[in-house]
């Protein structure tokens, strides 16, 4: 509580100091305290023109606290002292109102309004002075916008008319439509549209300056009659005007900057080259060829040149390739620390970037780890050893004959085949995991989307040895432990298929995944009469297989207020259902709550399911898992100073089970009760943003704790107890 009071006092002090920065304001000048932009026209979005205002007031933390200015004001005038230099560096110098910049802002606003079709727009500036502080109010008077009445295309070249489909107005006129507002943006869109169509149709020397617009309006009329005129081609100032020449590709050849020549198979070169002999020149095909070779790890860079054949409209294309080193070998030692247990690990990685001369990437990694475990009693061995061997082979294309070559060329795709073997020896048990997978990945950058399809993902878990002490204490049927724990120390086969997509355009981000396991094996089980074990599960090679379906949906909305302040809204939903050959989900497929990316008032795996408190009131990592998850977060983010950013957040959520388990009382999802079991937390965060990575420190407090029924403990926000409710998180990267 004392720390909280000191923090409040410190923030209040800085706030008060921020209000008294007059010592840095010269005579006859004023601190720009606030800038407002508004319009006299109802419904007009004046805020969208705020970027045209050149002077902004000093930034505020969370859009409320003028602490950067207050920090600067704490400094003295003697800049030879390090304390004054430091305060000025982390603070923010007062913004003094500048009439020159204000007038320039008015001109910029007026020009922006005219470009948006408001030809008779005016902008007024009003200033309100109080002491040494000034508020600037920009008032927009847009007036009546000009609108397009009629559009006519003046194009003499019949070939270009056909390409632009001017005989089909519904296809030709897109941005410039009758009744739409007459704006510079629409003119630019139409100019770019025509230019792109022609550059993709063989007009190698065409550029947008050949397109001009002529606008005519009657006196005192806001209707515009627009003419889109295409200028004739002229090779030079002395040459006569002609129709624009249309160029075709005569030949495509490849060359290399290395003496060893080209290291890729001819079929791979052809597959990644969108430029084809006999076809018209296309800027889109040129860019696609650059993109295709850029994603090949065997290629370092690509340079494409075109050569005109004299007195013809033919082009020869030369694609110059420079290759990467085909082989790399790396060795990496590392130190480990798991809950205070120290250890070491080493890894050796070999990579071949051009295995079959098709830019196939083979990556083989060997890793070994050792850790000394303390605090275990009753076990002969006190060491943890892990050895892992993994091989991945990635093809820079989809190995899918059922997909059209056009789709494969259009998508930035790859296929991946992987195998791994993991050996773990712990004092309590020995575990072996054999994995194999084959998956597709492809991107659609224009749609800000990426996709993943797991055709098969196979995991075989084998437990060759479990210590008698561990069996007696945790796994025996007569023990107080449960089926969930026992299930995770049995041999298990998981064969799943899945699909996932990601979308991110900067404002909206979405991740969706669905996977299912065991259905194919279940079909074979019935047809081939697989054996069943004592629990009634079908087995393959005396090992039960898992059967379930799982779906996840994650959505984030980022609302940016200005360069220093933004709001992030986030929701994460997950549901997994075991059925058929499984009554319990595999442990790694179950959900948990709490932690740095969830409800931050709880540590990881400390919350839920439902109102479950854990075994004997203690954290229970096995039982505090569930079959469904809900996370909801709202986080206000603000720039503080230098690389430091701050955040204030409210989190809510929990996990639940779909079935009633005796060992998880209160954990089952019930429609009439689940909303009462939603946990709520609040807190503050500090982030160090180094651009290429972010260090995050979040401090969360419990507000509503569903594990307790008494009002004092359930509504923790009314009776905060830092020892009971406070949780600190350290993480790398943003939470969502």
What are the functions of these language-model segments?
Residues 1-8:
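Bacterial N-terminal signal peptides that target proteins for export
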Residues 2, 20-337, 367, 549-551, ...:
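Periplasmic polypeptide-binding modules associated with outer-membrane biogenesis and secretion
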Residues 15-18:
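C-terminal motif of bacterial Sec signal peptides marking the signal peptidase cleavage site
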Residues 118, 203, 326, 357-359, ...:
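Strand-connecting loop/turn motifs
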Residues 162-163, 282-509, 600-601, 612, ...:
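Gram-negative/organellar outer-membrane beta-barrel architecture
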Residues 293, 350, 393, 512, ...:
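Hydrophobic, well-ordered secondary-structure elements that form the walls
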Residues 331-333, 362-366, 417-419, 510-514, ...:
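Membrane-embedded beta-strand positions of outer-membrane beta-barrel proteins
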Residues 336-339, 452-638, 648-652, 656-671:
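C-terminal outer-membrane beta-barrel translocator/porin domains of Gram-negative envelope proteins
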């Amino acid at each position: 509580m004392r720390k909280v009071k000191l923090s409040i006092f410190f923030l209040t002090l800085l706030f008060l100091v921020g209000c008294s920065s007059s010592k840095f304001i010269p005579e006859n000048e004023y601190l720009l305290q606030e800038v407002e932009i508004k319009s006299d026209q109802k419904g007009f979005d004046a805020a969208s023109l705020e970027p045209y205002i050149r002077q902004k007031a000093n930034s505020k933390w969370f859009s409320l606290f003028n602490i950067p200015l207050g920090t600067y004001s704490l400094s003295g005038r003697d800049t030879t002292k390090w304390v004054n230099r430091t305060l000025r560096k982390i603070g923010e110098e007062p913004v003094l109102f500048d009439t020159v910049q204000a007038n320039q802002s008015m001109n910029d606003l007026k020009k922006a309004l005219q470009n948006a079709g408001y030809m008779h727009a005016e902008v007024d500036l009003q200033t309100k002075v109080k002491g040494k502080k000034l508020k600037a109010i920009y008032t927009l008077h847009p007036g009546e916008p000009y609108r397009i009445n009629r559009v006519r295309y003046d194009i003499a070249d019949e070939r270009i008319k056909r390409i632009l489909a001017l005989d089909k107005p519904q296809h030709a006129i897109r941005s410039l439509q009758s009744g739409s507002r007459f704006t510079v943006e629409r003119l630019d869109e139409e100019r770019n549209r025509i230019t792109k169509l022609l550059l993709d149709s063989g007009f190698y020397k065409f550029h947008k300056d050949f397109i001009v617009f002529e606008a005519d309006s009657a006196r005192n009329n806001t209707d515009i009659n627009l003419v889109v005129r295409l200028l004739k081609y002229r090779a030079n100032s002395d040459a006569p005007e002609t129709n624009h020449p249309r160029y075709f590709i005569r030949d495509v050849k490849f060359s290399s900057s290395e003496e060893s020549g080209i290291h890729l198979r001819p079929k791979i070169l052809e597959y990644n080259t969108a430029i084809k002999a006999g076809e018209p020149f296309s800027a889109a095909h040129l860019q696609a060829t650059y993109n295709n070779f850029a994603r090949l790890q065997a290629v370092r860079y690509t340079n494409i040149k075109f050569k005109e054949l004299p007195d013809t409209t033919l082009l020869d294309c030369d694609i110059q390739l420079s290759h990467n080193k085909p082989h790399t070998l790396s060795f990496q030692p590392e130190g480990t620390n798991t809950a205070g247990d120290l250890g070491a690990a080493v890894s050796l990685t070999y990579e071949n970037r051009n295995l079959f001369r098709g830019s196939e990437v083979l990556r083989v990694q060997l890793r070994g780890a050792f850790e000394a475990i303390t605090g275990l009693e009753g076990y002969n061995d006190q060491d943890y050893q892990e050895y892992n061997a993994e091989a991945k082979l990635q093809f820079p294309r989809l190995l899918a004959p059922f997909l059209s070559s056009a789709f494969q060329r259009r998508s930035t795709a790859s296929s991946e085949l992987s195998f791994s073997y993991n050996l773990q020896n712990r004092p309590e048990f020995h575990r072996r995991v054999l994995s194999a997978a084959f998956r597709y990945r492809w991107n659609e950058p224009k749609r800000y989307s990426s996709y993943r399809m797991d055709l098969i993902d196979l995991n075989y878990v084998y437990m060759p040895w479990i210590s008698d002490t561990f069996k007696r204490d945790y796994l025996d049927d007569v023990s107080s432990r449960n089926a969930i724990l026992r299930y995770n120390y049995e041999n298990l086969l998981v064969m799943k298929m899945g699909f996932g997509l990601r979308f991110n355009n900067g404002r909206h981000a979405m991740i969706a995944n669905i996977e299912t396991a065991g259905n194919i094996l279940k079909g074979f089980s019935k047809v081939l009469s697989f054996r069943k074990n004592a629990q009634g599960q079908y087995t393959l090679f005396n090992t039960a297989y898992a059967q379930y379906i799982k779906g996840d949906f994650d959505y984030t909305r980022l609302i940016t207020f200005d360069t220093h302040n933004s709001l992030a809204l986030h929701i994460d939903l997950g549901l997994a259902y075991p059925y058929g050959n499984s009554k319990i989900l595999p442990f790694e497929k179950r959900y948990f709550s709490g932690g740095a990316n969830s409800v931050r008032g709880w540590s990881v795996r400390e919350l839920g399911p439902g109102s479950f408190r854990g075994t004997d009131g203690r954290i229970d990592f096995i039982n505090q898992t569930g079959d469904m998850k809900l996370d909801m977060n709202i986080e206000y983010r603000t720039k503080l100073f230098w690389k430091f950013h701050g955040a204030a957040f409210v989190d809510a959520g929990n996990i639940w089970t779909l079935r009633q388990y005796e060992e998880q009382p209160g954990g089952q999802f019930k429609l009439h009760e689940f909303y009462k079991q939603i946990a709520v937390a609040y807190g503050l965060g500090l982030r160090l943003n180094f651009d290429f990575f972010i260090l995050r420190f979040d401090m969360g407090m419990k507000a509503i704790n569903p594990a307790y029924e008494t009002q004092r403990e359930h509504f923790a926000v009314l009776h905060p107890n830092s020892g009971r409710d406070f949780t600190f998180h350290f993480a790398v990267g943003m939470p969502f």
